[in-house]
Amino acid sequence: RKHFLRFNGEPYRIVGIDGNPIYNTNPGTEHLEIGPSERIDVELTIDNTKQWQIESVDDNSAAENMVVKVIPKNIDEDNQSKTTETKDDVTENGTQYMDPIFKEIPTPDIEYDMLLGASMGMGNMEFTINEEIFPETEPFEVKEGDIVKATLINDSRFDHPMHLHGHYFQIIAKDGQKLDNPMVKDLINVKPGESYEIMFKADNPGLWAFHCHDLNHAAGGMMTTLEYQGYYSPFDIHENGNEPE
């Protein structure tokens, strides 16, 4: 599940997302939202005259003990301060501080729509892509060098952090509005009612998973594959039942 992190009200600067550097961002002091498997690098300068902490401020009792204390030397552990803030959303408006994959948005060779849904199946929740569950979901079929565009639409009441293995993609639009300063990621958390348009170059031949990183949703069917023409995986399903992503 996603988490909301607070750095005790200290100003911090986001310097990287999903392994990609971000430059010259403005400092923030609010809650930082991070989705399953998302990576966000931050830098901050601490007040070394007092103890403070990095903590989860999720509305979830299971996260109450997600706290990392930061204790400068010779400081009493009880000297603790807290603040109440709102949240920072690093995907809200894209960013003007990243190196894009595409400086000019090209015409895609292949386009896919991914309607992300949820419904009751045979006694369990099913999480669907275009009303199908894996392995019945339609794969992305590409050849090396293709420019691929995908539109992700969340038609459910759940967040879906969608993760593409083996590739980075550029987020070119949110809710139908083109982004002037697209982000480059390998995971995008699509919230209920949201849509994103992403684009990537098929430049890493293989058989790759594209799935929701809320792993309950992936296990419930929200997964597909990116398959390169001419690539064969020797993987076989053994008696233990392990299946490839």
Predicted regions and their residues:
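Residues at beta-strand starts and edge strands
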Residues: 1, 38-40, 110, 146, ...
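Histidine- and aromatic-rich segments of cupredoxin/plastocyanin-like copper-binding domains
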Residues: 1-95, 174-186
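Generic intrinsically disordered, low-complexity segments enriched for polar/acidic and small residues
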Residues: 9, 49, 94, 99, ...
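Active-site pocket scaffolds in enzymes
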Residues: 14-29, 113-245
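Solvent-exposed loop and beta-edge segments used for protein-protein assembly and interaction
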Residues: 34-36, 46-48, 106-108, 142-144, ...
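Hard-cation-handling environments
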Residues: 57, 110-112
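Extracytoplasmic/periplasmic copper-protein system
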Residues: 65-109, 220-245
